[in-house]
Curated annotation (Swiss-Prot):
PANTHER family linked: PTHR34136, UDP-N-ACETYL-D-MANNOSAMINURONIC ACID TRANSFERASE
Record-given protein name: UDP-N-acetyl-D-mannosaminuronic acid transferase
Superkingdom to which the source organism belongs: Bacteria
E.C. number(s) listed in UniProt: 2.4.1.180
InterPro entries: UDP-ManNAcA_Trfase_WecG (IPR023085), WecG_TagA_CpsF (IPR004629)
Swiss-Prot/TrEMBL catalytic activity: UDP-N-acetyl-alpha-D-mannosaminouronate + N-acetyl-alpha-D-glucosaminyl-di-trans,octa-cis-undecaprenyl diphosphate = beta-D-ManNAcA-(1->4)-alpha-D-GlcNAc-di-trans,octa-cis-undecaprenyl diphosphate + UDP + H(+)
Record's keyword terms, sorted: Glycosyltransferase, Transferase
Keyword check for Kinase: no
Broad enzyme group: transferase
Keyword Ligase: no
Biochemical pathway: Bacterial outer membrane biogenesis; enterobacterial common antigen biosynthesis
């Protein structure tokens, strides 16, 4: 592996997180020496760390994922505070997914999409093919029962997908990825939350200036005041951050 593709690990609350410097570094890491890595990508933000702290099952799923990375700006700031020499930047999951799809389209990597509403999923497929000529070898919307899971996993295995992205929200997507890997282990899995909705324009993402200032969370709160209860949970994370309890 070249130095460009190597990345240090930084531990927060006992979970090792990959320290990517920027998006090119992330892509070089995932495609080290021209070979796409296999395993599970999980985006880590403050809310997910809190959930992992309170729910042992969720923590076990996250801990089992090979590639945990700093998606939230608060997590990046905590890494920098705990490890002053760390050269780590936020790599937003939505941006990483788009970059991964663009690379997959360029290289002809087979992709399987899971999650979203049927119409959103169809629009996602159409846009991926039109924009980057992505080789989509199968898809499944998010409306399937646990009893239907094994048949889905068999489809994914038969498709030969090398990238499987799952948009079902946490922890559902982590459960699906974990279970699917038992049937189809030789692929890169990525949990992407509401990314398909953003990609197809059904949900508006914060403007770039808000993202660059690390205020995407505030934009979402102002756009969706109902999120206030979720945001209040983050006070506990702030205590961890400012008391060096990470």
């Amino acid at each position: 592996m070249t130095n460009n593709a190597a990345a240090p690990l930084y531990s927060l609350r006992g979970l090792p997180l990959i320290g990517w410097r920027d998006m090119p570094h992330a892509l070089n890491y995932l495609f080290a020496d021209g070979q796409l890595k296999q395993g599970t990508l999980v985006a880590i933000n403050a809310e997910k760390l809190l959930t992992a702290e309170d729910n042992p099952d969720v923590r076990a799923l996250i801990a089992a994922a090979e590639f945990k990375y700093a998606d939230g700006i608060s997590v990046v700031r905590s890494i920098r505070k705990k490890f002053p020499q760390a050269q780590v930047s936020r790599v937003a999951g939505a941006d990483l997914w788009e970059a991964l799809m663009a690379r997959a389209g360029k290289e002809g990597t087979p992709v399987f999409l899971i999650g979203g509403k049927p119409e959103v999923l169809a629009q996602t497929e159409e846009k991926l093919r039109a924009q980057w000529n992505v080789n989509i070898v199968g898809s499944q919307d998010g409306y399937f029962t646990p009893e239907q899971s094994q048949a889905l996993f068999a489809r994914i295995h038969a498709s030969g997908a090398q990238i499987v992205t799952v948009a079902m929200g946490s922890p559902k997507q982590e459960i699906v990825m974990h279970d699917c890997r038992e049937v189809h282990p030789h692929a890169l899995y990525m949990g992407v939350g509401g990314t398909y909705d953003v990609f197809t324009g059904h949900v508006k993402r914060a403007p770039k200036i808000w993202q660059n200032l690390g205020l995407e969370w505030l934009y979402r709160l102002l756009s969706q005041p109902s999120r206030i209860t979720r945001q209040m949970r983050l006070l506990r994370y702030l205590r961890w951050h400012y008391t060096d309890d990470l």
